[in-house]
């Protein structure tokens, strides 16, 4: 580490949101450009900064500050310089000269300790003297806080967030319960808070640490798709996290229950522990679904005649199950339509749309992702939106608490129970990937009396987010469900569809490289598999399916294996978008982002702003929100502005500060989970050994059904057979079905 010191000559740039500052300091006539998160420095101040010199591509050498200390002015010249800088509102150059002339080297002490004496100077009233004193106190408090936080090893960008949140309460919080940071501050998890607590001398068996650990494990479980954990599993994971043998868990669970942070329920003699937010979501969703489940009387002959009229006009023929789906949509407020590829879901939904159009009803279509919404629009000839956009997402976050935003709560949508959607019928496709938080937000915006039709393939992978919404709704047995199973003639010509159903039913699939749309390229060993994939994605498949290279997608079950996402992305980046002197880059950890890279948003960020642009680059539409699974291409990396601009597939341009790049990852290869709701002209799937829990039928089925024109499996046939035969799946702990059944029981028995 190196040190530089001097007077802050001028602030060149400051991002008021994150505190990133570019400034010059001067000492002994030498000027040094410094950069870092220093929200609270001002021109005229004398600082000692710690950091390293870095070479900027445009602006040559800069000093990257990691920590700093302020030195109070200690002579007349430095006081004059500080006061003349404008750091203290109400003091200009002339006033600064008068103050220093009166008090000399003792000026700064008098301003801090005897501020009333400033009123001795012409032009300064007693109230102005007190205002100057208060400004100095505020600045001193900030500097003291920054130094205090740095002693705990807290980096300046995080120190900035902590001080903004707590102000002068930071001393009590860090010395008594640093684990509050994990609850309140975005970017602080349990592990960061635990490290700070260790430096603060908090005991490893502190009740604050144990309760924070319990809550952390529950929240981590939601990242794995769970809405609760069984007691024994929770205890085991908390003990592993804390590295202590915690006694009397029931006491801590009771405390957390009293604090309204968790809920404990007993199911089949098993104690189930929920983060309260997710328990409430499941309970709310169950209640709202129940409210929508109303029956409407309608003459069967009238329904049959209208369906026949639509069939005749559209030149289609529905089978009996499809007609049943239409009739149930007419007669019920809530209907679920499920089925695999080629079973006529689109034809059924189109008929339902035509039916309600004849009724003159207002219809809204939605899907979880931009890709899925685009597909729905193309298939139905009726505009579909993402669920987020239909609900009119808002970038505002109550009280600046972005931690809550990550949960996807309905408070971040303009459409809610107080401002419901204006629609008579709402149809939502790709329901298998809708998690409990989005379902909660959606249902809040649906009025009683509005028909809700949920469509999806229950055999697909469940949502990335917590819950198992579609499966739980169906398994509750409480709502009308229609399962489409017949494969129609046109679909029966597609080996993708035929083989997908064979995989799902556990039937034998014939593999060869001569199929027109379901190819198997035999290769042994990860390197040989990857080389074959390179040839396919660049030289063979684009012309074969008539698509751009970036429209094709490599899907792989895992992240860490020899053919996992991380390794494949590095290899495919170098192959498809190699480094070039004219391409700007940005390194983030082990990943290099490069102009021209294919990237994916990997978390929901409700505050990111976006714009759409005309062909001339003029903004034509603006909004907020970028969502998990959105894919695009890096258009520009600016080392001067320290940001990256991505153009997403739907035409949105989003600019990320360098500090936000953890929200992106390369997307030449993505996990099968991340592909949910998407469809690609062709998919390439490596068949190589990976983690057994991911080598299952559900993953394979989901992967092959992502392809529209061609599936290309590359690797070892025995791996394909292993996956197709492995029906075990990772247990997902969710209880929406239980909550639905509870409500029905109460309705039926009044208890």
Regions of interest found by a model, annotated:
Residues 355, 359-361, 370-374, 379, ...:
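Conserved helicase motor core of SF1/SF2 NTP-dependent helicases
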């Amino acid at each position: 580490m190196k040190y530089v010191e001097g007077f802050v000559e001028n602030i060149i740039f400051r991002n008021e949101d994150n505190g990133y500052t570019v400034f010059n300091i001067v000492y002994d006539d030498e000027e040094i450009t410094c950069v870092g998160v220093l929200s609270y420095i001002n021109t005229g101040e004398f600082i000692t900064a710690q950091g390293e010199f870095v070479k900027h591509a445009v602006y040559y050498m800069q000093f990257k500050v990691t920590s700093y200390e302020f030195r109070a002015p200690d002579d007349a010249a430095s006081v004059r310089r500080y006061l003349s800088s404008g750091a203290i509102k109400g003091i200009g150059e002339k006033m600064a000269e008068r103050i220093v002339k009166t008090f000399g080297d003792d000026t700064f002490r008098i301003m801090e300790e005897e501020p009333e004496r400033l009123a001795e100077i012409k032009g300064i009233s007693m109230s102005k003297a007190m205002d100057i004193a208060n400004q100095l106190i505020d600045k001193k408090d900030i500097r003291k806080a920054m130094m205090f936080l740095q002693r705990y090893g807290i980096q300046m960008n995080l120190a900035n967030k902590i001080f903004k949140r707590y102000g002068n309460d930071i001393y009590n919080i860090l010395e008594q319960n640093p684990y509050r940071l994990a609850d309140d501050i975005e970017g602080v998890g349990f592990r960061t808070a635990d490290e700070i607590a260790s430096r603060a001398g908090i005991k490893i068996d502190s009740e604050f640490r144990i309760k924070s650990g319990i809550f952390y494990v529950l929240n981590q479980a939601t990242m794995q798709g769970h809405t609760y954990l069984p007691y024994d599993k929770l205890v085991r994971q908390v003990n592993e996290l804390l590295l202590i043998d915690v006694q009397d868990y029931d006491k801590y669970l009771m405390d957390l229950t009293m604090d309204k942070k968790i809920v404990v329920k007993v199911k089949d003699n098993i104690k189930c522990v929920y983060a309260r937010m997710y328990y409430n979501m499941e309970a709310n969703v169950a209640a709202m679904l129940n409210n929508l489940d109303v029956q409407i009387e309608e003459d069967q002959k009238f329904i049959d005649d209208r369906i026949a009229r639509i069939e005749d006009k559209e030149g289609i023929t529905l089978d009996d199950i499809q007609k049943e789906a239409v009739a149930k949509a007419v007669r019920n407020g809530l209907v679920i339509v499920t089925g695999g590829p080629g079973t006529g879901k689109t034809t059924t939904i189109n008929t339902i749309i035509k039916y309600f159009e004849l009724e003159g009803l207002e219809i809204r279509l939605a899907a979880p992702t931009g890709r899925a919404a685009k597909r729905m629009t193309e298939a139905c000839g009726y505009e579909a939106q993402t669920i987020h956009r239909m609900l009119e997402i808002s970038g505002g976050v109550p009280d600046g608490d972005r931690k809550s935003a990550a949960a996807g709560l309905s408070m971040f949508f303009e459409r809610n129970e107080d401002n419901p959607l204006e629609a008579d019928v709402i149809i939502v496709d790709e329901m298998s990937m809708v998690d409990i938080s989005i379902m909660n937000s959606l249902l809040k915006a649906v009025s009683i009396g509005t028909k809700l039709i949920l469509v999806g393939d229950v055999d697909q992978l469940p949502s990335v987010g917590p819950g198992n919404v579609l499966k739980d709704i169906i398994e509750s047995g409480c709502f009308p469900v229609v399962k489409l199973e017949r494969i129609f003639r046109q679909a029966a010509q597609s080996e993708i569809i035929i083989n997908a159903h064979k995989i799902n039913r556990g039937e034998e699939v014939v593999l060869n490289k001569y199929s027109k749309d379901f190819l198997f390229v035999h290769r042994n060993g990860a390197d040989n598999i990857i080389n074959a994939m390179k040839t396919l994605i660049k030289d063979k498949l684009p012309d074969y399916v008539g698509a751009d290279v970036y429209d094709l997608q490599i899907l792989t079950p895992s992240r860490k294996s020899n053919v996992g996402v991380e390794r494949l992305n590095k290899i495919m980046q170098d192959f498809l978008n190699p480094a070039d002197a004219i391409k700007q880059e940005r390194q983030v950890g082990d990943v290099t982002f490069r102009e021209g890279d294919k990237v994916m948003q990997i978390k929901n960020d409700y505050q990111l702003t976006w714009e759409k642009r005309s062909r001339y680059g003029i903004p034509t539409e603006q909004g907020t929100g970028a969502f998990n699974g959105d894919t695009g291409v890096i258009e520009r990396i600016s080392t001067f502005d320290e940001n990256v601009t991505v153009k997403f597939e739907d035409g949105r341009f989003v600019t990320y500060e360098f500090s936000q790049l953890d929200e992106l990852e390369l997307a030449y290869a993505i996990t099968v989970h991340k592909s949910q709701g998407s469809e690609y002209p062709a998919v390439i799937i490596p068949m190589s050994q990976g983690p057994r829990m991911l080598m299952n039928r559900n993953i394979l089925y989901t992967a092959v059904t992502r392809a529209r024109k061609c599936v290309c499996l590359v690797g070892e046939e025995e791996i394909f057979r292993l996956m197709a035969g492995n029906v075990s799946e990772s247990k997902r702990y969710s209880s929406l079905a239980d909550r639905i059944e509870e409500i029905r029981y109460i309705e039926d028995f009044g208890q």
